[in-house]
Regions:
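N-terminal Rossmann-like dinucleotide-binding module
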Residues: 1-46
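C-terminal helix-rich "cap/oligomerization" subdomain common to oxidoreductases
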Residues: 66-68, 104, 285-332
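Rossmann-fold dehydrogenase core element
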Residues: 105-123, 141-144
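Predominantly a Rossmann-like dinucleotide-binding segment in NAD(P)-dependent oxidoreductases
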Residues: 124-195
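Contiguous beta-strand/loop segments that form the cofactor/metal-binding neighborhood of enzyme cores
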Residues: 184-255, 284-292, 329-332
């Protein structure tokens, strides 16, 4: 059993703990929160022995071998680095860090300390995403794709009311492309590799983060358009178009349904059964990396490439975070 700790006590942390336990590979051993009351409240639902209000104390503790980080984006890098330096394996929620420089430093730290660093981009681990990748030859010569994820944020009204929620605050390295737009970008890179170039546009809020945007990725023979928003909903599926037909994906982040629409024929449902908690697959992947002591793994290349193009997209749209090095602004 891999003894792990969690940083963050929100809904996504609970989902991860439940699925981590379901893999049969993990045991929750510690919880961190700035508030002991909050840590205790979270721990009441699990048999947890250790509660921490000090990150350094938890990082030094022999009670844990690994940590799951689900804190605000701007804290991901410093917390990841701290635990790697104390020889703990790290699974960090996406995005792994605020920019490419931080991701490079995190990967270097994992290598220096010979510990697994794994970015929690669940989509790449899903059975239906793997099916989607295997099904690409069905469409023949590819010409274009639309990867779409637009979802009205439950915190947007708070922003409109004059509050400053983390979701729309550049101090926390947040915004549309860093949150749900990430799924579109990372999925494209997981399917087709890095583009030749990108052209990005976005509508910025007064806070300085992007509310929504569009990115066109140039792959030479084909293009991929990313559409993302945190201030509006979309009912459109994502679509990959080729000369022999199209692949249609409902809710890209979870690949809820994958269909093949042959040119001139009826649509075929290719969807495979998936666990209701789609975090199960990334939890299993993290456990396997630890068991195999696979410090070097393909996920690191995907994390770096995604960070590289996230950084470039923000450079083009003018979204700047305090974490960015302003003497060499957003260089990719």
């Amino acid at each position: 059993m891999i003894r792990f700790a969690v940083i963050g006590t929100n809904w996504i942390t609970r989902q991860f703990v439940d699925t981590a336990h379901e893999t049969g590979k993990f045991r929750l051993a510690a919880v961190y929160s700035r508030s002991l009351e909050q840590a205790q409240s979270f721990a009441n639902d699990y048999p947890v022995e250790h509660l921490f209000t000090s990150l350094e104390a938890m990082a030094q503790s022999d009670a844990i071998e690994a940590v799951y980080i689900a804190s605000p984006n701007s804290l991901h890098f410093s917390q990841t680095q701290r635990f790697l330096q104390h020889k703990k394996h790290v699974m960090c929620e996406k995005p792994l860090a605020s920019n490419l420089a931080e991701v490079d430093a995190a990967i270097a730290c994992a290598r220096d300390n010979q510990r697994v660093l794994f970015e929690a981009f669940k989509t790449a681990c899903l059975p239906n995403f793997l099916l989607l990748r295997e099904s690409l030859p069905k469409i023949g010569r590819m010409h274009k794709a639309l990867l779409n994820y637009c979802q009205y944020s439950s915190r947007y009204q708070r922003y409109l009311n004059g509050e400053n929620p983390n979701t729309f605050n550049p101090a926390f390295s947040n915004g549309s492309i860093m949150d749900i737009g990430y799924y579109c970008l990372a999925s494209a890179i997981a399917l087709w590799g890095e583009p030749r170039s990108v052209q990005a546009s976005a509508n910025l809020l007064e806070s300085g983060v992007d509310a929504h945007g569009v990115v066109v990725m140039d792959y030479g023979d084909f293009s991929v358009t990313l559409q993302h928003s945190k201030v509006s909903d979309s009912v459109l599926a994502s679509e990959i178009q080729g000369e022999r037909g199209s692949l249609v994906i409902e809710k890209l982040s979870e690949c809820q349904k994958v269909c093949f629409a042959p040119r001139g024929a009826l649509m075929q449902d290719l969807t495979q059964p998936q666990h209701i908690n789609t975090m199960l697959y990334e939890a299993g992947a993290f456990a396997q990396l630890i068991e195999n002591h696979a410090v070097e793994h393909p996920g690191l290349s995907l994390s770096r490439a995604t960070a590289k193009w996230l950084t470039e997209i923000r450079r083009q749209t003018g979204v700047i975070f305090p974490a960015d090095d302003l003497t060499h602004p957003l260089t990719a």
